[in-house]
């Protein structure tokens, strides 16, 4: 329903009450000063700071010494709040009202004044559960948009940090902030991000994933082509590398672009510990991912087609453990992997410590019982458990590891090691074809620029880094 404001205060009040009919949180407060100044104050109960409204808006209005004031004069001489503005149209007025501002209308002037009186409840800052660190800042984003922006400003006191707002999402009118550093982020990347955001046609945006699925490259790929984080220090670090970040109102998750494969093997505290320790940790993560994705398939392929590759004692031990089992090696491995994934999902959905306890105890009890009952073999249980544990070292690639694991497992069961090799080459070709906001997904896989080699599979000490650039050119020294 379109809203039109006039010079008549009573007509404006009636129009606002009609628009917010059957909404018990909508409050209208009429005021009139001894001099005859008549105003109406509108706000939504539960979204505002009532004390600020009483002291900074209503009290000055009832003490005004003039009988008529324009919106500009009201804002400059009466309202005692620094964040107040004359709103040019009703759409912006309603948006401000719904977001927790207080709107003031006066007799004789249809232009509303919006005053920042937000006072809704919010969660305090805490360390993100999914990005805990052993050393470094422990502050994480919250669901409150402006608080998240203040965390960025506090970490980077530079006017080159640009924060550009835009509303998306139709009914929800969700504010999305495009963050970049002027002079560091390539203009082409900023334009590409804005172009993708302008294609959003969602009726509502309630989480960062709504936007991520719409603007990322290759939504069918199991590899992440858009970075996600809940930590302000990570966002600032990626902005300094020349990337862009998106902060979405109502969610603690920030999106960063471009995203490359190397980023998935980097942890938050790699930059807060000695360089050699960080480099060793990164290499271990790479080995853990490869073990998690490849070893189950290699086990089945070797057991079914290439037993001559196994040491004799190992082959005899596996054969003895599998004697009398009802399932072939392939289905044994598939069943174990599925049970583990179900236990992991159940643990994630169960609240608190019960979930992690249930996953550990459930895996131990079921595995021991299955081996004791001669339903599954102990080597298969060991391999699945090792693959599951090593896969947890790279949480950003858990989905990719799962897809690769099952795909290569089927290929290895059908064609042996040749199937595993061909499947691995197909996944490598897929990685080569991926791009993230115009950048190759395997960028810096083999560093050709010094700025790239300073922080790739390992990193140099901070004394050896010059400028930590993500999109360095080959002509840079």
What is the predicted role of each segment?
Residues 157, 198, 344, 371, ...:
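Short polybasic/polar patches that bind polyanions
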